[in-house]
Amino acid sequence: MKTIKNGVYPTMITPFTDDNKVDYDGILQLLDWYKYRGVDGIFAICQSSEIFYLSFEERLEILKFIMANKPEGMDIVASGHTADDLETQIKEARAFIETGIDAYVFISNRFAKEDESDEVLLKNMKYVAAAL
């Protein structure tokens, strides 16, 4: 990955059709909307995108679609390692990074359970970062 440019990076929602499927035409409209407002990039796969309600396969498919249709010059930032275990988090993060995104954002609360110490969080975060 590279250093992303300074600028505006709004979070992107995931639009759905009336029958609760991902609305890919809606995603195209959102990409155009962001383009014409001059944003520097979008945070495409994030909590605003309903990542905890989508399967890994759905999140990855959406991200690949966004990467294939993003406006020229627009940076794409993503997240989405929602699994409880670290090995699956690594697999998920690696798959998102391999789409060619410009930056990946870790979800810090996925690295330790609520009753675990800060030391566990830091150890797990370093482990995942080193694996990527």
Question: What are the functions of these language-model segments?
Answer:
Residues 2-132:
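Active-site beta->alpha loop and helix N-cap motifs at the rims of alpha/beta catalytic domains
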